[in-house]
């Protein structure tokens, strides 16, 4: 890996939930500004993630958070929608300017390798890429991407909780908990539920 000038680390958050978008982040870390405590976001407490996320945004050479919508998940399937979110993050195609660092495209264009957590790669990437199983535990850039993707998506789900009260999105973040299942049964699916997911599809009716 040392032969490559810069590495883009990529990870996603939100493949499994019944509701909300799937989010991906791409991060190029600065070797001159190491960040202590980077690991898989799922291994960290919410407090630790919230502490690390601004450090990553501050110290990384470049970063971007992107997503694929519920509609894209239902149209493409969750695997392809995840790949779409990853490609968008790698290319700097965030939903807003606040979701990426300045000059992201300029910096990322100099990267020689893309490291993606998992066992499969999206197609049509701008640089050589490798999939690394449990890469969020072994590659700091992937760990950083994992944290940015997770904290960004969690904040989105908290906002959706205000738009669609009663489902408890700020707590379970759209995952299939008992409380979420009970709310679905009581209220029916709402517009941010993934209709292609079986537990939601079984209850399709206006909310």
From Swiss-Prot:
Cofactor-binding details, from the entry: Manganese or magnesium. Binds 1 divalent metal ion per monomer in the absence of substrate. May bind a second metal ion after substrate binding.
Entry annotated with the keyword Metal-binding: yes
Source species: Hyphomonas neptunium (strain ATCC 15444)
Domain called RNase H type-2: residue spans: 5-207
Cofactor or coenzyme needed: Mn(2+); Mg(2+)
Stated name of the protein: Ribonuclease HII
Main subcellular localisation: cytoplasm
GO terms under cellular component: cytoplasm; ribonuclease H2 complex
């Amino acid at each position: 890996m040392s032969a490559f000038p810069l590495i883009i680390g990529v990870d996603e958050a939100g493949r499994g939930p019944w509701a909300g978008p799937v989010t991906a982040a791409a991060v190029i870390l600065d070797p001159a500004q190491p960040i202590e405590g980077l690991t898989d976001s799922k291994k960290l407490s919410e407090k630790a993630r919230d502490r690390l996320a601004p450090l990553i945004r501050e110290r990384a050479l470049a970063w971007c958070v992107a997503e694929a919508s519920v509609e894209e998940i239902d149209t493409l399937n969750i695997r392809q929608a995840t790949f779409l979110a990853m490609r968008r993050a790698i290319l700097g195609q965030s939903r807003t300017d606040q979701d990426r660092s300045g000059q992201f495209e300029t910096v990322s264009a100099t990267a020689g390798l893309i490291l993606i957590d998992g066992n499969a790669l999206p197609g049509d990437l701008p640089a050589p890429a490798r999939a690394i199983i449990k890469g969020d535990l072994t590659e700091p850039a992937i760990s950083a991407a994992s944290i940015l993707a997770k904290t960004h998506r969690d904040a989105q789900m908290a906002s959706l909780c205000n738009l669609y009260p009663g489902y408890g999105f700020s707590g379970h973040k759209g995952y299939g908990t008992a409380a979420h299942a009970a709310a679905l049964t009581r209220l029916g699916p709402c517009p941010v539920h993934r209709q292609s997911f079986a537990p939601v599809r079984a209850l399709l009716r206006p909310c």
